[in-house]
A protein has these predicted regions:
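N-terminal, active-site-proximal structural segment of metallo-dependent hydrolase catalytic domains
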Residues: 1-75, 87-92, 152-153
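Beta-strand-turn-beta hairpins that frame and shape the catalytic cleft
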Residues: 2-10, 93-95, 99-105, 117-137
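Short, Asp-centered acidic motifs that coordinate Mg2+ and/or phosphate
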Residues: 8, 43-44, 133, 167-169, ...
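Active-site metal-binding loops of divalent metal-dependent hydrolases
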Residues: 14-15, 49-50, 138-140, 167, ...
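Active-site environment of divalent metal-dependent phosphoester hydrolases
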Residues: 17-20, 52-55, 88-91, 143-146, ...
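Active-site neighborhood of phospho(di)ester-bond hydrolases with catalytic His/Asp-centered motifs
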Residues: 45-48, 81-84, 169-173, 194
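Conserved beta strand-loop-helix elements of the APE1-like EEP
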Residues: 74-77, 90-105, 205-220
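Metal-dependent phosphoester-hydrolase catalytic domains
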Residues: 108, 125, 156-169, 174-230
């Protein structure tokens, strides 16, 4: 099955709700993100902190897209899958996946560890040239102990829903400043580039390595961090 896939390009990106900065000085970045996402040329784009809608931001920014951010960012011909992680006073946000390939199924798993952080996993099953591919989009918590428990929930979900012989990608914002989750992920057969570390946060001057792509049943060929305004 894997040989039929040839190569697959996967991107993970925390878009921070399509806005740069906080408070009165914040500015709308979703249109720049559209150019970035379409410029990736990726087969699969895993997104975190994606707004389904937000009434406050819609009133503030004149050019706020009418569509949800996942649909807005999807390149022509791609399918967009979005599921909510957090519901707020003015709207909601969560994880999304944009796929060049047909979507066979999807699911969402709440992995919130405490009431101050709402976190989730988006599990999407794709048909890549007739072969199944599972992709899990993850956004883990800010506290290390929470992340450890959330990784165990990832493992339990994989055991229930992903056959061991079917290729798997788990990608997203792990908030893992070191490589403290690697061993736990490896226990589920998930591997990443062990000896290559690229800083990914903050995007304009990356200093920390928070974003990861793990794989099982696939062989990583190369890794890079795109550079630009975002």
């Amino acid at each position: 099955m894997i040989s039929r896939m040839s190569s697959l390009r996967v991107v993970t990106y925390n878009i921070h709700k399509g806005v740069q900065g906080l408070g009165p000085a914040s500015r709308l970045e979703i249109h720049n993100l559209l150019q970035a996402v379409q410029g990736f040329g990726a087969d699969v784009v895993c997104l975190q902190e994606v707004r389904g809608f937000n009434r406050q931001m819609q009133k503030r920014f004149a050019h706020w897209p009418a569509a949800g951010q996942a649909d807005y960012l999807a390149p022509p011909g791609y399918q967009a899958v979005y599921r909510t992680n957090a519901v707020t006073r003015h709207g909601e946000h969560g994880n999304a996946l944009l796929s060049r390939w047909p979507v066979l199924g999807q699911g969402h798993h709440d992995v919130s560890d405490h009431r101050f952080e709402q976190r989730g996993l988006l599990h999407v099953r794709l048909d890549v040239k007739g072969a199944p591919l599972h992709v899990v989009v993850a956004h883990l918590g800010l506290i290390h102990a929470s992340r450890e428990r959330q990784v165990q929930q990832i493992g339990a979900m994989l055991e229930r829903e992903v056959p061991p012989h079917e290729p798997l990608v788990v990608a997203g914002d792990f908030n893992d400043w070191g490589q403290r989750l690697h061993d736990a992920m490896a226990a589920f057969g998930l591997r990443t580039f062990e000896h290559i570390r690229h800083a990914t946060y903050p995007s304009r001057l990356p200093l920390l390595h928070l974003d990861r792509i793990y794989a099982r049943g696939l062989r990583p060929l190369s890794v890079q961090v795109p550079h630009g305004g975002q």
